[in-house]
Structures are given as structure tokens and as C-alpha cells.
Amino acid sequence: MLYALQWRKYMVEENNNEELRHLVRIMNTDLQGAKPVQYALTGLPGVGRRTAKLIAKGAGVDPSAILGYLPEEEVAKLDTAIGKFEDIVPSWMLNRQKDLATGQDKHLLGTDILLTFREDINNLKKVRAYRGLRHERGLKVRGQRTKSTGRRGSTVGVSRKK
């Protein structure tokens, strides 16, 4: 059985006749070309390991192939498979189910995740929901205890008797 470093060395030796692209651009994001496809795709916000493996299989690309050695056609296949990910998987695998505005199931990728998350928190603050108030005050939101933990800032310390 080959360990991870041995496997990478084996893959590099196998493909040494081609030039390794160290950065591969997919969905306006630079991904590491030295990693296997299933791990390199996790560099996209909104794509985890399981999602990346499904995207690679949906595109017809070997998930264990090194991303930097893939030809441009296969990289383009990966790009289109990422766009069609919502159609391939069941709704419970998507990261935005029953969107508040549209009611649709979506899978957000890239900067859309950050913008939507920030928008949701601002909406909670605007309607003065309990969670929104906790976010405003910088306190814990999910019901954790706050008597002794979660204290931030510099420690005061105890003054010594003279």
C-alpha cells in the first residue's frame, strides 16, 4: 500500500513527461495543481471533500489524478460539473435549502456563501431576532453558557498585597 507522499511521488514520476501547472484556475479561484483533484477542489469555498469527489465523478475525471497534469478539456469539464452540481445531487446535500427569499434549494459557491451569510445575519439584526441581538452584542449565539467561558479581551489579573 502506498502512503500519501509515496503516492504523490509515484504520480509525479508517472507524469514527468508533462509539465505540472502549479496553479489551476477554476471558478475565478486559483487551486493548487500539485494536489489530487478531490483535495484541490476543496480550495473552493462551498466545496468539501465529499462534494469534490462527487463533482470529479460527475465530470468523468479520476478523483485521485493530480490536478496540474489534467488537460484543459478536463479542467473545463470540472468547471461545468461544478455549475451543474445542484442538478446532480439530492436536495439534502445542498448548502442552502429553502432559501428565505425564493424558497428554492441552492448550492452556493465562492463569494456567494460569504455574502449570503452576512446578509442573513444582517436580516436577523434588522428584525431584532434573539440570534440577531446576540450577534450585535458579540455574545454566543447557539445557547452555550457564558458565565465563565467565552470571555475575551486582556486578562486583568489580581493585585498582590503589600
From Swiss-Prot:
GO cellular component, one term: cytosol
Signal peptide: none
GO molecular-function terms, A-Z: rRNA binding; structural constituent of ribosome
Annotated stretches, region: Disordered: 142-162
Pfam families associated with the record: Ribosomal_S13
Gene3D superfamilies, per database record: 1.10.8.50, 30s ribosomal protein s13, domain 2
Keywords attached to this entry: Ribonucleoprotein, Ribosomal protein, RNA-binding, rRNA-binding
InterPro entries: Rbsml_uS13_C, Ribosomal_uS13, Ribosomal_uS13-like_H2TH, Ribosomal_uS13_archaeal, Ribosomal_uS13_CS
One GO BP: translation
Function: Located at the top of the head of the 30S subunit, it contacts several helices of the 16S rRNA. In the 70S ribosome it contacts the 23S rRNA (bridge B1a) and protein L5 of the 50S subunit (bridge B1b), connecting the 2 subunits; these bridges are implicated in subunit movement.
Quaternary state and interactors: Part of the 30S ribosomal subunit. Forms a loose heterodimer with protein S19. Forms two bridges to the 50S subunit in the 70S ribosome.
Family, as annotated: Belongs to the universal ribosomal protein uS13 family.
Listed name of the protein: Small ribosomal subunit protein uS13
